[in-house]
């Protein structure tokens, strides 16, 4: 069994593969109209030429790499929004010089617009996806002695946010969708469990129906982490709108981005008030009190400060207007690739909990195990097609500092109260998740891939797959 020193390479780069957090979003092709795909050889035909890894000519002369999605769509809309903030001389969200005769309005309007887009009542704009998680957990009342169940495969921020509140992270396995396994989730519930943190990982929704049913049955709160899935839906519902709260990241690797930022959404006024106070030094400002629309139910309390700036919100307002187009472009490319290779004998893709709701920024192909996966990746890279293991996150229970339960200070309440005193992490906490990570090959997609780029991906997979899968 590899230890996390090997697995942790997914945080920055798989050996020789340039895996970076710019691939944080995940693959799930959306349904699209049937398209004409490039000519291809018969499904069972051997490749016409040797693989590039074996000395043959590559499919492409240069490496095909997926670029950051949101910044590719920057134009005069973002520019004009930023100029408006500059000319108004009011970059802080609550007050300013108001040189154009109006108070700052980018943050408050983004919150209204994003809440409407996500079909929720409230939104709090914050500085990052991590601070969104921390604010949402505060709104849900999580603290020492509470347990929060989360998937073993996710980003470190999920674990970190739980620890920040002195609560105990409890890991559940993921399934072939790479999202939390509802059955294993239920097995991990104890009387101390307070919140289920379901992470819509790598651009694809978790299976929310059984998760919500478990939560209702066991009287638990559900926090949807949509950091890697802005623009994703589940059975017609935007992710983040089905649980008690949802969070999003607008970091540069995400669907839309001003460089960094985050948001919390909810339709529960108490969760909104708690998250709002937590992100703003315990205060409920007049602007948010007006949005709340009812008397405050909480007192001022000591907390951090994670307010978004007007500059960040300005870019996000312009990006939000383009979100549906970006998602449609992602899905178009991924659907065409999938259609072009789906007839290959025995090919298996990532399981989908919603065939049309994913972001569509990865194509994942299953293999027999790590050795075959690694050869598949090397072969595709030799053809100048970027390919990676499951990226953008980590198998948290085997991260060295998590397995050792390292904290900022000794005596951290997460591990001195209740089950936290005896809980053990490590590989035995997630064998199924490790197996899944060892099997999947990921091809990152770009919403602005050209027709030739799409054709090259199809050609490379069709060239490599029959050879590698026999090995």
Show which residues each predicted segment covers.
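N-terminal secretory signal peptides and thylakoid transit peptides that target proteins
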Residues: 8-32
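Conserved PLP-binding active-site segment of the aspartate aminotransferase-like
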Residues: 351-354, 359-370, 390-408, 438-451
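Conserved PLP cofactor-binding pocket of PLP-dependent enzymes
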Residues: 283-293, 336-341, 377-440
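C-terminal segment of N-terminal export signals and the immediately downstream linker at the start
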Residues: 36-93, 116
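Active-site region of PLP-dependent enzymes
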Residues: 229-235, 239-362
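PLP-dependent aminotransferase-like
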Residues: 52, 138-226, 233
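Phosphate-binding glycine-rich loop
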Residues: 96, 105-147, 161, 171, ...
């Amino acid at each position: 069994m590899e230890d996390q020193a090997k697995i942790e390479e997914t945080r920055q780069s798989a050996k020789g593969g340039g895996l970076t957090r710019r691939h944080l979003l995940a693959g799930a092709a959306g349904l699209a109209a049937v398209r004409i795909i490039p000519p291809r050889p018969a499904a069972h035909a051997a490749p016409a030429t040797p693989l590039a890894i074996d000395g043959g000519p590559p499919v492409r002369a240069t490496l095909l790499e997926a670029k950051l999605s949101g910044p590719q769509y920057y134009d005069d809309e973002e520019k004009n929004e930023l100029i408006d903030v500059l000319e108004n001389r009011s970059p802080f969200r609550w007050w300013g010089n108001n040189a154009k005769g109006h108070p700052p309005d980018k943050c408050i309007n983004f919150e209204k617009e994003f809440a409407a887009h996500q079909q929720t009542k409230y939104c709090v704009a914050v500085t990052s996806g991590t601070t969104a998680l921390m604010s949402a957990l505060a709104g849900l009342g999580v603290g020492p002695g509470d347990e929060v169940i989360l998937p073993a495969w996710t980003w470190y921020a999920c674990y970190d946010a739980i620890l920040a509140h002195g609560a105990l992270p409890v890991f559940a396995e993921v399934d072939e969708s790479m999202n939390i396994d509802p059955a294993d989730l239920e097995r991990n519930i104890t009387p101390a469990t307070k919140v289920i943190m379901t992470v819509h990982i790598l651009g694809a929704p978790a299976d929310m129906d059984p998760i919500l049913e478990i939560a209702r049955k066991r009287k638990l709160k559900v926090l949807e982490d949509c950091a890697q899935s802005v623009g994703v839906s589940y059975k017609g519902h935007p992710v983040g709108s089905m649980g008690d709260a949802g969070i999003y990241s607008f970091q540069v690797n995400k669907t839309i981005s001003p460089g960094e930022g985050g948001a919390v959404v909810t339709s529960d006024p108490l969760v909104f008030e708690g998250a709002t106070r937590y992100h703003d030094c315990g205060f409920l400002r007049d602007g948010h009190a007006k949005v709340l629309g009812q008397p405050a139910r909480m007192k001022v309390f000591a907390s951090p400060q994670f307010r978004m700036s007007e500059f960040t919100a300005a870019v996000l307002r312009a990006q939000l207007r383009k979100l549906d187009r970006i998602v449609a472009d992602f899905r178009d490319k991924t659907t065409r690739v999938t259609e072009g290779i789906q007839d290959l004998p025995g090919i298996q893709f990532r399981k989908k909990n919603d065939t049309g709701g994913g972001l569509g920024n990865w194509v994942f192909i299953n293999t027999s195990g790590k050795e075959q996966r690694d050869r598949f990746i090397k072969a595709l890279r030799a053809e100048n097609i970027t390919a990676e293991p499951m990226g953008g996150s980590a198998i948290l229970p085997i991260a060295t500092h998590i397995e050792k339960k390292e904290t900022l200070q000794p005596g951290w309440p997460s591990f001195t109260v209740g089950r936290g005193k005896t809980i053990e992490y490590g590989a035995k906490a997630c064998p199924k998740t490790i197996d899944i990570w060892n099997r999947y090959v990921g091809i990152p997609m770009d919403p602005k891939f050209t027709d030739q780029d799409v054709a090259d991906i199809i050609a490379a997979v069709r060239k490599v797959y029959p050879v590698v899968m026999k090995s």
